[in-house]
Amino acid sequence: MNGKYKVPDLSGIGQEPAEETLAHCEIVRIDQYRPYMKPVAGFSSSGNGDLRTIEMAARKAMEFVRYATGLRREEARLSQLNIGLKCGESDTTSGFASNPAVGVVTERLTSSGATIMFGETPELTGAEQVLVKSFEKDELRTEFMKVYKSYFDFILSQGVDLLGSQPNKGNIAGGISTIEEKAMGNIQKIGRAKIHGILDTAEAPREPGLYFMNTSSAAADLLTAMAAAGAAVQLFTTGKGNNVGTAISPVIKICANRETCENSAENIDVDISGIIYGGSSLLSGADAIMECMARVCSGEYTSTEMLFHEEFAPTRLFPQS
């Protein structure tokens, strides 16, 4: 592995607005979380033993639950949110409908002051020369191509053939024949919005705008990184169905494949299959997504929350920038 790897800093999990308190039973510096102005506690089994540590953490968790249930929601606009974007188990409906509908949402919200992040560096292959034109400045275009090449070189250094694994079997069954097709569908999630900056994995944006985050394409890894970067809600499009979620921030599943929406209805939050089969448009699909976001940010549970899909997966191997 040539020693060229790093582990992303996930201390930003502490700023996630959906998490009112923090309790950790792991090797972590608690002072990393104190700047986020939330109750925080840490426990170590060293010197206490497993059972004693579990008891201490459970009692503190009970205290934190009492504190959290006393908090009250404050009114805010969707344009004040930090939002993460992801697609998984993509098919032709992803590139033609659900991703473009999210692209309309991205255009609307970034133009009104929201912060939006997208990533999946290796799955931009074949669309990188198109995406690079969306960056606001020449220096960002240069930086993006450097970041992309570094990631691709890293993949090759591990003896992995990306073009031999993408698109995957599910993508192919859904009508995607090449990585270029998949990548072109992927970037539809940002619409015609301009990219304001580039982030490292789990790095929080410092100001509003649309950001590219250099990440793995693995669903659990990316959702975890976006949550650590402060995503209050995440928009996840799927064609064939993907059940991954996170305990840190709500994940809204969006689908335009009628068969998936019918057979996996309990896993889909926004059915916009009418864009493909008739009865609705990209604009009405975007409206449905934004209406769902408003409900979720007001307390409504997403499918992943109700079904307890609570994956947490820090990226384990990543190119050193």
Feature map (PLM): residue ranges:
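Conserved beta-strand segments of alpha/beta enzyme cores
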Residues: K6, P39-A41, T115, Y211
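Buried hydrophobic positions in well-ordered alpha/beta secondary-structure cores of metabolic enzymes
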Residues: G14, E19, A61, I83-L85, ...
